[in-house]
Amino acid sequence: MASNFEEFVLVDNGGTGDVKVAPSNFANGVAEWISSNSRSQAYKVTCSVRQSSANNRKYTVKVEVPKVATQVQGGVELPVAAWRSYMNMELTIPVFATNDDCALIVKALQGTFKTGNPIATAIAANSGIY
């Protein structure tokens, strides 16, 4: 099986200003991807997979999204991160799930955050579900 620890587009802006993250570290079973921005302004993704029981694998995915801003110090405009948003997700899949089962799970995840769906709309508007 080929490695899947490779660069990918995290934020798709239609090809203009896309945010790509590249492999940066793989230690203790945790894969890390980071964007090319300065460390304080970088997007970061981590993922680990572990056996949570005899019958289950648990995927833990974390995404950090920075609020990119600038600040003037001594007449020089410097980039700073005003704050960060964090997403943490745990996904448990039975070890006996087929590839088709897992592909369906991925489609469900994509649908959950698809633009226009209630959860994505609430997050995009920084509001709740009502």
From Swiss-Prot:
Family designation:
Belongs to the Leviviricetes capsid protein family.
Task: Give the signal sequence positions.
Answer: none
Source organism of this protein record: Enterobacteria phage fr (Bacteriophage fr)
Q: Could you list this entry's UniProt keywords, alphabetically sorted.
A: Capsid protein, RNA-binding, T=3 icosahedral capsid protein, Translation regulation, Virion
Lineage start: Viruses, Riboviria, Orthornavirae, Lenarviricota, Leviviricetes
| Residue ranges, annotated region (Viral RNA-binding) | 32-105
Q: What does this protein do?
A: Capsid protein self-assembles to form an icosahedral capsid with a T=3 symmetry, about 26 nm in diameter, and consisting of 89 capsid proteins dimers (178 capsid proteins). Involved in viral genome encapsidation through the interaction between a capsid protein dimer and the multiple packaging signals present in the RNA genome. The capsid also contains 1 copy of the A2 maturation protein. Acts as a translational repressor of viral replicase synthesis late in infection. This latter function is the result of capsid protein interaction with an RNA hairpin which contains the replicase ribosome-binding site.
One matching Pfam family, short form? Answer: Levi_coat
Annotated Gene Ontology MF terms?
A: RNA binding; structural molecule activity
The identity of this protein, by name, is: Capsid protein
Q: What is the protein's quaternary organization?
A: Homodimer. The capsid proteins form dimers that assemble by group of 5. Twelve such pentamers are linked together with free dimers. The homodimers binds to the viral RNA via an operator hairpin, but also to many other RNA sequences in the viral genome; this interaction probably shifts the virus from the replicative to the assembly phase and ensures specific encapsidation of the viral genome.
Instruction: Give the matching Gene3D superfamilies.
Output: MS2 Viral Coat Protein (3.30.380.10)
Q: Where found, per UniProt?
A: Virion
Principal place of residence = virion
Q: Which GO terms describe its cellular component?
A: T=3 icosahedral viral capsid
A Gene Ontology biological process term:
regulation of translation
